[in-house]
Every structure is written in C-alpha cells, then in structure tokens.
C-alpha cells in the first residue's frame, strides 16, 4: 500500500516527522497515516486546533503515551496555546482519573520546560 497524496500533505504539514514505526512497521504506519490524515481528518471537516485537541484527549483517555507524545509535537508545531493544551489534560481527570492524567501532565510539563514555556500558566478557574 502507498501513502496517499492527501494524507502525506496533511501529515507533513501538521507533524512533518515520521516516527519509529515507519522504520520498523512501514505498512502499519502507512495505513495509520492514510486513515488518520487521509480519511479521518478530511471527513471531520474540522479546523486543525479542534482536530488535534480531540486527538490528544482521546489518546490520553486510552493511555497512549507514545502516540500522545507524537501528537503533542504537532500541537506545539501548530501554535496551539499552552493554556488550551493543559485545559484538555486537566478536564480529562474526572473521566479517566488522576493516576492516568498525572503521567500525561508530567509529559506535557517536560516538553513545556524543554521549550521554555512557563509551567505555571495563568489560572483559568471560573468557579469559587
């Protein structure tokens, strides 16, 4: 199977980096990219930010740390606000539990620190 042109264009625009699966499991990687970006992204007819946030939230919910990390790089590359990223992670807590969210929050903080993004973001609470 070949990587479809539309899937390739979207993948390169949003992520631009083949991961380890391309070397070890090329056929799987191609199928994944064709589905994720050639079908799912196109049919969702959503803006890039919304698509990435849904993908981040669902990947967090199932505990996919490796895929979350790959998506996270795309989120940063596409200038999605750190506040919005953390909000997705925070809001997952009541649904998937603190133990699972803690791993992803830690991963997020490591990336933010590496990129010199402040770890203490402006408070967003709206309840008292």
Question: PLM features: residue spans?
Answer:
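Preference for long, well-ordered alpha-helical segments
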Residues: 86-107
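Residues within well-ordered alpha-helical secondary structure of globular protein domains
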Residues: 34, 57, 91-94
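Mid-chain, well-packed structural core segment of small domains
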Residues: 66-86
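Short alpha-helix boundary/capping elements
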Residues: 58-65, 97
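Single-residue recognition of alpha-helix capping/boundary positions
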Residues: 49-50, 84
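Short, structured motif recognition centered on aromatic/hydrophobic residues
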Residues: 51-59, 88-89
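Acidic, glycine/proline-rich low-complexity segments that act as flexible tails and inter-domain linkers
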Residues: 1-49, 69, 76-77, 101-128
């Amino acid at each position: 199977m070949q990587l479809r042109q539309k899937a390739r264009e979207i993948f390169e625009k949003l992520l631009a980096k083949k991961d380890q699966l391309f070397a070890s499991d090329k056929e799987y990687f191609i199928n994944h990219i064709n589905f994720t970006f050639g079908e799912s992204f196109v049919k969702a007819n959503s803006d890039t930010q919304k698509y990435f946030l849904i993908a981040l939230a669902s990947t967090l919910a199932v505990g996919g740390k490796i895929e979350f990390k790959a998506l996270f790089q795309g989120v940063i590359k596409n200038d999605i606000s750190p506040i919005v990223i953390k909000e997705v992670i925070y809001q997952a807590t009541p649904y998937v539990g603190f133990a699972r969210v803690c791993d992803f929050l830690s991963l997020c903080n490591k990336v933010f620190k590496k990129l010199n993004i402040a770890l203490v973001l402006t408070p967003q609470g709206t309840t008292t």
